[in-house]
Amino acid sequence: MKKTPLLRSLVLSLAMLVSLPTFAAVKKEFNVCWTIYAGWMPWGTISSSKIIDKWASKYGIKINVVQLNDYIESINQYTAGQFDGCTMTNMDALTIPAAGGVDTTALILGSYSEGNDGVVMKGKGKTLKDLKGMKVYLPELSVSHYLLVRGLEKAGLAEKDVTVVNTSDADIVSAFGTASVQVAVAWNPQLSVIKGTPNTTEVFSSSQVPGELIDMMVVNTETLKDNPALGKALTGAWYEMMGLMKAQDASALNAMAAASGTDLAGYQAQLKTTHLFYTPHDNMAFVTSPDLAKTMQRVASFSFDKGLLGEGAQSADFIGMRFPGNVTVGDASNMKLRFDDSFVKMAAAGTL
């Protein structure tokens, strides 16, 4: 989900330039973007089925839900102010827009990876300890990199015990198909292909660190502050779709499967390793748990160690983060990432 450190540096520099003179205001039309991933497919169907139009109309606004083909590029465009909202993981929200000075609110924490990300090694019966001394192929500075480090920690190893080889998510499947590559870290759908390779072992997966790789819809904080209708419409549309999915609505699920390039069985297999919050009450329990702040502190530490919090970062606490209950971590004078439960509360209370 990340490209090179140079590209990241350029993106953060651009974000600082773009964000300084930008002032949000009340407006009537908004643009949000999403990319293909099991937990974000609902956004495409929310758009194509006109559910978003219904909710936007309720609040007197228009919301354009735009699919982009490149995940990192979608975040870059959001960070540069070209979109009001965007789907991204918790780590990427911290290290790209927030680190770039763009005050960002996690509006909907829709799901977390519960096996959609994994470390796969060639050979049967392998374990995490077998990684010692190996080359590990993965998209460097991504959630895959984070997952590897978490796995190594659990095995009593450290990143210095392996050699990380930067490999794009687009190339990871073909790389694993070569004899020289013995270990790869990937996310679905690439992970399912790699796991399908004969004589392999998944030695670690995101199911062993539940709730740490979170799939979110974020929005610009100032835009949301000036336009709460945007938050209400997005949240209302999302939970209407969650209701359809929970009820196994064939039309909705088939549309998502087709858009993701698979059939219904294939998409449902991906959903099995995606912990979707089908009700706002379930989401509330997750968002208000003290574990969320602990997870983000861990993510911030990893990000600081990798130099992902920007050149001015002197510690993992450089970026301030706010959580429900007015809980804060990091620098309160540099508050750039906020986890807001107010709109989910409205959904739970039926007041949207």
List the model feature ranges, each with a label:
Residues 301-352:
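Conserved C-terminal helix/tail region of periplasmic/extracytoplasmic solute-binding proteins
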Residues 63-64, 269-277, 314-326:
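Short linear loop/turn motifs
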Residues 25-166, 173, 182-188, 211, ...:
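Short, glycine-/small- and polar/acidic-enriched structural segments
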Residues 19-21:
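N-terminal signal peptide c-region/cleavage motif recognized by signal peptidases
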Residues 92, 165, 171-265:
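Pocket-lining segment of extracytoplasmic ligand-binding domains
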Residues 1-11:
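Bacterial N-terminal signal peptides that target proteins for export
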Residues 56, 82, 87-90, 97-100, ...:
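Sec/Tat-exported extracytoplasmic proteins
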Residues 226-312:
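Secondary-structure end/capping motifs
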